[in-house]
From Swiss-Prot:
It comes from Pyrobaculum islandicum (strain DSM 4184 / JCM 9189 / GEO3). Belongs to the UPF0179 family. The lineage of its organism: Archaea, Thermoproteota, Thermoprotei, Thermoproteales, Thermoproteaceae. It comes from the Archaea. Pfam families: UPF0179. This is UPF0179 protein Pisl_0688.
Length: 167
């Protein structure tokens, strides 16, 4: 579960409040608070307020209302994956096999993105195929600073693997 510090209205600054980012208005992108407000959130994803921080009296450029810093947790996405990929804890590549089916998350997840399946909720049939309804998180892509010269991910958390003959 990814945690993000962001800004919400005073009315939304309640622990347990859930909200979904539908889109980001163009007016927000020129606001000085954008980077700490909607700039950290992803359209199509849902969040839950888990901690409230002290307010510094900032106001929203659009509503004029006070905004409050909160810690929000990204909630899992509910969608379809083929049955052969539906294993709790598995990290799989979303291929969009369910495109056109009800509950297909193809408007949120792009084909080729890695997802981690949290829980299998049930089964469904669409287009003569069996799918599992699952809760999952989209795994974040590595930061540009973590990419090497050829665009491959370099994990700096462990030493390089060396192959040595056994003695």
């Amino acid at each position: 579960m990814r945690k993000i510090i962001t800004l919400v209205s005073r009315e939304q600054a309640v622990i347990g409040h859930r909200f979904r980012v539908v889109s980001i208005p163009d007016e927000c992108k020129s606001c000085k608070l954008y980077a700490v407000c909607l700039g950290k959130l992803t359209p199509g994803r849902s969040y839950e307020v888990i901690e409230i921080r002290p307010s510094l009296g900032q106001r929203c450029k659009i509503t004029g209302e006070e905004v409050v810093p909160v810690v929000a947790a990204e909630l899992p996405i509910v969608g379809l994956v083929p049955l052969n990929k539906a294993l709790e804890g598995a990290i799989v590549t979303f291929e969009g096999e369910c495109k056109g089916c009800k509950d297909c998350p193809d408007n949120i997840v792009k084909p080729g993105e890695k997802i981690k399946i949290i829980r299998v909720l049930g089964r469904t049939r669409c287009k003569d195929r069996d799918f599992a309804t699952v809760e999952f998180y989209i795994l974040e892509a590595p930061l540009p600073s973590e990419l090497g010269a050829v665009g491959t991910y370099q994990d700096h958390s462990r030493a390089p693997l060396l192959r040595r003959p056994l003695k």
